[in-house]
Amino acid sequence: VTPKVLQPEELKNYWRDIKPGLEKVLLNTPTASWIPEDVYSAIQNRKAICVLGIEEEEVVGFFVGYPQANSFFAWAVWSQGDLSEGINHLLWYAKEVGCRKVIFQSDRKGWARVLRKYNAYPHTWVMEV
């Protein structure tokens, strides 16, 4: 799998591959407060970055996010198969843009299992009032 940093002017060409992945992320994350079109707008307006995973000219995964201070906030991560390679690309990209850590928020319990081998730890606690 080869990572490809998507340029905003290329987004229309790849949206048919990205949107279904975002919809799958949303199906598994019922507390998410965004829709795929929010992601489209953020990429198009250079507020977010999308890195595709390309294999044999096909999109097999992607992540969307943005740098903030010394961290890279991963907004959405999707892969057709094992997430390990995509996570490795995410860590590589974060380092490339000068970030020292990757952060994201999810209420999906499966992330604890996936991220254990990366020495990741829970980062956000929420108290509703």
Descriptions of predicted regions:
Residues V1-W34:
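Short amphipathic alpha-helix that is part of the acyltransferase structural core
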Residues T2-Q7, E85-G86, E128:
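Short, solvent-exposed coil/turn linker segments
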Residues E9-R16, P20, E37, G81-N88, ...:
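Generic alpha-helical secondary structure signal
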Residues L22, L26, I43, L90-G98:
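Hydrophobic, Leu/Ile/Phe/Ala-enriched alpha-helical segments that form helix-helix packing faces
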Residues T29-A48:
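Active-site rim helix/loop that mediates acceptor-substrate recognition in acyltransferases
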Residues Q44-D82:
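Conserved donor-binding loop and adjoining core beta-sheet/short helix segment
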Residues A69-Y118:
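Acyl-donor binding region in acyl/amide transferases
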Residues Y121-V129:
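Conserved catalytic-core motifs of GNAT/GCN5-like acyltransferases
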